[in-house]
Design a protein with these regions (language model features):
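Short, well-ordered alpha-helix to beta-strand connector turns
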Residues: 4, 26, 207, 225-227, ...
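N-terminal Rossmann-like FAD-binding beta1-loop-alpha1 element of flavoenzymes
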Residues: 4-31, 362, 366
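Short, solvent-exposed loop/turn segments at secondary-structure junctions
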Residues: 13-14, 36-38, 100, 155, ...
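Dinucleotide-binding Rossmann-like beta1-alpha1 core, especially the glycine-rich loop
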Residues: 48-123
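Active-site/ligand-binding neighborhood in enzyme catalytic cores
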Residues: 89-93, 99-228, 232-239
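C-terminal catalytic lobe of FAD-dependent flavoproteins
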Residues: 310-367
Length: 367
């Protein structure tokens, strides 16, 4: 008989939910992670008394009451509402695109005026069959919004001009004709008081966790410890990249402590011009309404991904989609292994959807 029922590779949200649920019904789990900390990309660490989101801003939002009640077992959430702003050459615009944005851009006051301005610009552009992201965006919101708030930012995000990006990346652009700056129209929203790491710690309470353990480097010995494996690492790496590497975008952060109590007045400021090299600046204290004497900011740079870099966003184009479909066939046929999470399923996953997926899988598994 093996020592554990489940070896869970990855101490992020998916792995932690699975471990918590399995432990509840008496299963013995070992959670391992190759990093030196738990919580995966939602890891927060205290700096100057401020919970810093080491891998970028994570704002919990969901319409799923079950998921909301689930996370509230492990943390108390504050009332933070995501209302980012865009800085275009020193002009500040509210996001998502709404009446505050249009008023600042054109001086319009009513929804009818804003709609008329957008329709006029769309008509002037005359695009009926968008061939790239630039044409797609202009056909949806007109030239002014595109030039000031989409073009530079999106180009930086993807590392190539919008004219070279496929139209399907932007299926729709949320345009609101109300004076509402709430980015996520979710029923439940907030940040866990004390940060995400403490929340994941509570999920993993009573479960054995080993850090700085590279599963792929010691697979046989680790597999021998448990009856089944839950793998939340990169699916292509699991199979030794035998079909080729899936592509990601990576992100690089420059984080610094500043001797001021308030640097930018908002948690998230996007820099939407092409000239500023970073895509946004995060001021972490505003996520928890901090009043500390100092502040911590992170400049976020989008970067090409190379093997060995931290993978952030899957490149969801046709080529990578087809390659993942082949890997999924291999994964489905792999005996005794459950693949899950952002990297295990090669998908962009909001936190609530990760929890939903993990609960769904673990309930079927333990039924």
């Amino acid at each position: 008989m093996k020592q554990y029922d489940y070896l869970i590779v990855g101490a992020g949200l998916y792995g932690a939910v699975f471990a918590h649920e399995a432990k509840k019904v008496g299963k013995k789990c070992l959670v391992i992670d190759k990093r030196s900390h738990i919580a995966g990309n939602i890891y927060t660490e205290p700096v100057e008394g401020i919970n810093v989101h080491r891998y970028g801003a994570h704002i919990f939002h969901t319409n799923n009451k079950t998921v909301w009640q689930y996370v509230n077992q492990f943390a108390e959430f504050n009332r933070y509402t995501n209302s980012p702003v865009a800085n275009y050459h020193g002009e500040i615009y509210n996001l998502p695109f709404n009446m505050n944005t249009f008023n600042k851009m054109w001086g319009v006051v009513t929804p009818a005026e804003a709609k008329a301005r957008i329709e006029q610009q769309k008509a002037e552009a005359g695009i009926t069959d968008p061939q790239n992201l630039e044409e797609q965006a202009i056909s949806l919101v007109g030239t002014d919004i595109y030039e000031k708030l989409i073009k530079g930012y999106t180009g930086k995000q993807w590392g190539r001009p919008c004219t070279e990006l496929p139209a399907f990346i932007i299926k729709r652009l949320p345009v609101r004709f109300t004076y509402d700056n709430n980015y996520f129209n979710a029923l439940y929203q907030g940040i866990p008081n004390g940060g995400y790491t403490a929340m994941v710690e509570n999920m993993l309470e009573g479960t054995e966790v080993r850090l700085n353990v590279d599963y792929l480097a010691d697979r046989e010995a680790l597999n021998a410890l448990a009856d089944k494996v839950v793998y939340t690492g990169p699916v292509d790496a699991y199979f030794g990249y035998r079909l080729g590497a899936l592509q990601y975008r990576s992100v690089r952060f420059e984080t610094e402590v500043l001797d001021t109590d308030n640097y930018q007045g908002n948690a998230v400021v996007n820099y939407t011009d092409a000239e500023t090299p970073y895509t946004r600046i995060i001021e972490h204290k505003h996520f928890e309404f901090g009043t500390q004497p100092k502040t911590v900011i992170s400049r976020e740079y989008s970067a090409e991904w190379n093997k060995g870099d931290e993978p952030y966003y899957p490149v969801n184009d046709a080529k990578n989609g087809a390659l993942y479909a082949e890997y999924k066939q291999l994964a489905d046929a792999e005996p005794g292994v459950i693949f899950g999470g952002r990297l295990g399923e090669y998908k962009y996953y909001d936190m609530d959807k990760v929890i939903e997926a993990a609960l769904d899988v673990v309930q079927k598994e333990l039924a």
